[in-house]
Amino acid sequence: IPPCIPFIMYAMATGESVSELFLAGIVPGMMISALLIFYAYYYCRRHGEDREKIQAKMDQLKAKGFFNILKESIWALLSPVIVLGCIYSGVASPTEAAVISVFYSLFVSLFIYRSIKVKQIWGIMVEAMKTYAPILFILATSTAFSRVLTLMQVPQDVSAWIMTHFSNEIVLLIVINVVLLIVGMVMDTTPAILILSPILLPIVEHVGMNPIHFGVMMIVNLAVGFVTPPVGVNLFVASSLTNVPMMQIAKKAMPMIGYFMLALLLITFIPAISLCLL
């Protein structure tokens, strides 16, 4: 869903339109969101974890009233507006917009909500470093790994092997999906897109697949890899933030990964899901 940075990287690697990719991602993104919301609702209804706590929070919110809640949250809601506004107006790049968002959030927390104090900033920075240091290490090693693969011409060999052994369109797309899922588990999104897009795109175009459709399929694949053990980066983020063991989170995430896979199959074999807004 816009402003999806991997779509921008895919556009850079293939020359496709960023705006068309953003449009193509809306319906698949909403479909995936709906599936995950359905599972979360079903899980909470069935297992009832923290039901009393959730109900108490809901009663508290209802007592406040919608407009009071909106008034309290308006400054926080402006943060994504500022980020998207900076990106789409050309005022800042996505990275620069993220920095602007950090300073805006810090200003709001210090002077409007007053939820933190100046003396707490250093501790917050230390906690942020503890959270993201393992992630940066993973990204660094995955970038080096992708460089080694490029030098060994592994992507070209994989492409040649796929073209040689699979001529059926359905089987070919399934194999490409499997390759992308495996890559997404061990490699960061950006190098994966930059390395594999120019190699796999001619293959899927050969069987009549739209490049925009393939871009959506690829990004969804890599998104699944981000939450798939053993190297799913988002698992490390969740583990660091919640102090819950990573494998425990991974176990709970497996049903959601299953819904992701269902969405991936629908996106792969029903092009209209991605292309209906173009």
Task: Give each language-model segment a name.
Residues 1-278:
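Alpha-helical transmembrane segments of multi-pass membrane transport proteins
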